[in-house]
């Protein structure tokens, strides 16, 4: 199966690592020139990966948060990075890479993508997407790429200079999804 992922941030790379196996051909499309741009600046460049105080009570939609946190817990997050070869440092319940450098996180994620033969395509600017005969057709950079499954992992509008410019909302709309406006 050919699986396409739009966005090479933390969510896109982790999704690719989780679905890449001998049965799946996985590619990531990133519209900037670098992967993990927002990771590089998170935690003032130290990249806080998770913390022990994560709970559903800290979210507006507690039912949804409960489902998500039960599916992939703080311990699951720590184990994921350990399995990728990243040693973590606990600072009062907040977890950082041992190096305290966000670049370490990007390096281990990129290494895992390479081990799993995930194809990274940077500077790819999507102009159109649609679904035809159970396939996803993605057009951009004078190319057409076809996928059996598609994951949109573009982030929100939090940091346009890193690539989180809200483009994922328009991509989701192309497939008929409703977008709930931010408050």
Label each PLM-derived region with a short phrase:
Residues 104, 114-183:
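Predominantly flavin-linked oxidoreductase catalytic cores and closely associated redox partners
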Residues 81, 109, 172:
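Residue-level signal for inorganic ion chemistry
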Residues 44-92:
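Glycine-rich active-site loop/strand segments that organize a redox cofactor
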Residues 65-73, 92-111, 157-164:
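Short beta-strand to alpha-helix junction loop
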Residues 2-28:
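N-terminal Rossmann-like FAD-binding beta1-loop-alpha1 element of flavoenzymes
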Residues 12-14, 35-38:
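Short N-terminal binding/cap micro-motifs at the start of the first secondary-structure element
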């Amino acid at each position: 199966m050919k699986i396409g992922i739009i966005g090479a941030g933390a969510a896109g790379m982790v999704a690719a690592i989780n679905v890449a196996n001998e049965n799946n051909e996985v590619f990531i499309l990133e519209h900037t020139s670098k992967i993990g741009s927002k990771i590089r600046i998170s935690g003032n460049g130290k990249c806080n990966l998770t913390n022990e105080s994560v709970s559903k009570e800290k979210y507006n939609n507690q039912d949804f948060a409960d489902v998500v946190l039960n599916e992939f817990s703080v311990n699951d997050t720590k184990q994921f990075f350990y399995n990728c070869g990243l040693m973590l440092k606990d600072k009062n319940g907040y977890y950082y890479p041992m190096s305290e450098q966000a670049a370490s996180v990007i390096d281990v994620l990129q290494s895992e993508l390479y081990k799993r033969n995930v194809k990274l395509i940077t500077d790819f600017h999507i102009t159109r997407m649609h679904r035809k005969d159970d396939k996803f057709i993605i057009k951009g950079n004078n190319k057409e790429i076809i996928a059996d499954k598609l994951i949109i992992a573009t982030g929100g509008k939090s940091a346009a200079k890193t690539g989180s410019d809200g483009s994922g909302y328009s991509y989701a709309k192309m497939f008929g999804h409703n977008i709930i406006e931010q408050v």
